[in-house]
């Protein structure tokens, strides 16, 4: 059977939304390794680290995100990625801010 490499991102995203951040981090790292140009994996890795309180790791991941996407802001997250629930949008924006990324 064919299993696309993006399954790691999608499962990691699900774990992130469920608050299972450690599992999400592992999957986002694998997703980045397999598809380094897929920027959402990098963004959610930043968020997961921030939610776990691992701010230094979140900041390191944010630097990597900015290398891949130089003009990224938390506003980019809500503009480019479909985030329906307001509470999820706020959590993502807060996580990105904790990592030192600009809001606009």
Q: Each predicted region: which residue ranges?
A:
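Alpha-helical protein-protein interaction modules
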Residues: 1-104
